[in-house]
């Protein structure tokens, strides 16, 4: 695997993402937890099983002492880029986007972590909120229906790749829950 500076797609504070032949390689900083990298690979593998069009996991490896996740490269433009460059068709793009979101929510994956559990942990960690407010939020959260439908967690037009044939691929799956 040859990772070159000119093949960088995006650089974040905790990772650098490369285009490498027919793959995308996310190389995480040395301090990024190994368990988080394997968890992202596991989440992606579980979503593969739902039948959604996503970049499939190719492997997890060490690259120069840093953990890396290799996934399929999906050719196309982000829906965000298409919306920005073709404003006259924004309504069609929004309809396609909503249809894709409904397709995602129509999938189940019972082995993924629960979004309600994540939100409860986050609410409990908000020490700036008084106990009564936290309790009210937790009560409202608990009253929400229980299910195992997939929730992307960061679904926005920049996380949808539209291929030349119009096929939409969902990317950036690290925040997916049920």
Residue map of PLM features:
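ATP-binding glycine-rich loop module of kinase domains
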Residues: 11-37
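The N-lobe alphaC helix and its flanking beta3-alphaC-beta4 segment of protein kinase-like domains
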Residues: 35-50
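Short beta-strand micro-motifs within the conserved protein kinase catalytic domain, predominantly
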Residues: 56-67
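Conserved short submotifs of the Hanks-type protein kinase catalytic core
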Residues: 65-77
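Conserved kinase catalytic-core helix
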Residues: 80-115
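An alpha-helical support segment within catalytic cores of ATP-dependent transferases
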Residues: 106-153, 158-164
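Pre-DFG segment of protein kinase catalytic domains
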Residues: 169-172
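Conserved small/polar residues in nucleotide/adenosyl-binding loops
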Residues: 176-178
């Amino acid at each position: 695997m040859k990772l070159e500076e000119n093949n960088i797609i995006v650089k974040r504070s905790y990772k650098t993402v490369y285009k490498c032949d027919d793959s995308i390689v996310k190389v995480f900083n040395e301090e990024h937890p190994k368990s988080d990298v394997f968890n992202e690979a596991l989440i992606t593998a579980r979503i593969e099983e739902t039948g959604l069009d996503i970049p499939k996991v190719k492997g997890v490896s060490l690259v120069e002492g840093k953990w890396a996740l290799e996934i399929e490269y999906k050719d196309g433009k982000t829906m965000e880029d298409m919306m920005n460059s073709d404003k006259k068709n924004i309504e069609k793009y929004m309809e396609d986007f909503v249809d894709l979101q409904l397709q995602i929510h129509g999938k189940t994956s019972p082995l993924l972590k629960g979004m309600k559990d994540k939100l409860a942990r986050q609410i409990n960690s908000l020490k700036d909120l008084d106990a009564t407010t936290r309790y009210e939020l937790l009560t409202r959260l608990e009253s929400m229906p229980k299910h195992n439908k997939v929730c992307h967690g960061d679904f926005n037009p920049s996380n949808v790749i539209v291929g030349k044939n119009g096929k939409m691929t969902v990317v950036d799956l690290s925040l997916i829950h049920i």
